[in-house]
């Protein structure tokens, strides 16, 4: 069905968050029109990690089984000291973990998640997808939202959901706060398994923590590839953005770590470079018939691997808020915001703190290692209950 005004809901952005939002609307029978600025379908990036909360959200969106077919189910997670190669922390994510949180922990190629969502969108007759359509101007009345794209086209909707990322045009129009450039740079690459060191081909996300830097690797696509994510504190004044990376630059930041993890930096044929950013959490991101979702609402650093996970949660919560509000957008958007602000702010701030833990040096490194080495898996599970224990039936609980 269309909205009571005979107009679709406009969604700015066709990434994971935008597609998930469209599916949430589709499951309510609400027509949606996705405005994606890219001329082609697809997601940049490489591997991502999906916690139990992400799988709960995928199930609620009707794509859980499809996503599971592409995922690699890991056996544990490890944090290693990149200087002396000792294991700092070990957390099993097998059967005990699954029983605790109701879903698995897995790694997956970002493009595979996007593809599953996009295929489901194409199968949903109430969703229209427009490429090469960049939001340029937004106006809101009591009855509708009007979007002008960068080619002068006009799109009228009953509501607008901004899913347009860290540098959201929708957020700029209604909030206008600055991006917080972290000074941390992330390099990402995918390496074929045949070229990856045999002793590091583990069925686990493994992080090597060094001073002001760390590396993460884990398998993708049935173990045929390995994802490599490398983070360091830049010596330069950075501006948020994505570019091609330089092997010389990335290797120059890891001279102080052990040879075993450092060898990984020589493997990729090419790198992509992200100068990362987040924003300060805000208490309001719904404005009448306009709301924000995913990175547009709560951009976060990568240290908790929750960017995609929280966007999926957002979409499900938005659908639940619409159900509880009889598809009346203004109260539904307020209810959705009320249910998400505190939780997502906690993730944003916790991700920053986890970056400090990963990159500890000097005495802080020694304290971190001593605190975590003797920690039992159950204590890690308890500490992560607030994050991984998210449930759809509690989505509207603030």
PLM-predicted stretches and their roles:
Residues 373-398:
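C-terminal auxiliary extensions adjacent to catalytic cores
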Residues 193-200, 237, 324:
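Short helix-loop capping/hinge motifs at secondary-structure junctions, enriched
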Residues 241-272, 329-330:
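Flavin-binding catalytic cores
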Residues 203-238, 247, 254, 276:
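Active-site substrate-recognition segment that forms the wall
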